[in-house]
Design a protein with these regions (language model features):
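Sensor-1/coupling segment of RecA-like P-loop NTPase cores
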Residues: 1-6
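A short helix-turn-beta junction within AAA+ P-loop NTPase domains corresponding to the substrate/partner-engaging
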Residues: 8-29
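Alpha-helical lid/collar subdomain of P-loop NTPases
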Residues: 37-168
Length: 169
């Protein structure tokens, strides 16, 4: 749409008659299939499952354009993966470089902190190895929906990682 792209031009009828028009809409469910195939970070997928409205945002403000796109989420995912390998933490300012909508960037950065907390608290490596404590199940039983969904997505993400490693062998 022209409001998102200044290089968009109106074509005359002769030109329009010779080209094919493809309307593209932001669709999280379609992107999610792609995301699983390319290994988007589980924290990104988990967050977007909870906050689908933040998948694609475009706003004009007095301070300029604020936006979040699928490309931004994918690039942020790659950065998170690199930071994890280096043992570095992703903070709000870094997130905002990829998600150029301050409210969404702040919300995701807060979610990422919770995600890491759940990762440590629930001992997902041990759960996947078949070992878990009774209190872990009790804690999950009484956890909020968001927390349970995050833990499920953590497990799914770790399993996807293990399957990928197995395929590469």
């Amino acid at each position: 749409p022209p409001e998102y792209n200044k290089s968009v031009r109106e074509f005359d009828v002769v030109t329009l008659d010779r080209i094919k028009r493809i309307d593209v809409e932001a669709d999280f469910d379609v992107w999610k299939e792609y995301a699983y195939q390319v290994g988007i970070h589980p924290a990104v997928l988990s967050y977007l499952e909870l906050r689908k409205e933040n998948f694609y945002r475009m706003e004009n403000t007095v301070d300029g354009k604020m936006f979040v796109t699928a490309r931004g989420w994918e690039d942020l995912s790659k950065l998170i993966q690199v930071y994890e390998k280096l043992g570095k933490e992703v903070d709000r300012e870094v997130v905002h470089q990829y998600l150029q909508h301050w409210k969404t960037a702040k919300d995701f950065a807060n979610y990422l902190e919770l995600y890491r907390k759940y990762q440590k608290e629930y001992g997902l490596e041990r759960i996947l190895a078949g070992y878990y404590e009774k209190d872990t199940l009790e804690r999950l039983k009484f956890a909020s929906f968001d927390e349970r969904l995050s833990v499920v997505n953590l497990l799914v993400g770790k399993m996807a990682e293990l399957f990928k490693e197995e395929d590469e062998m």
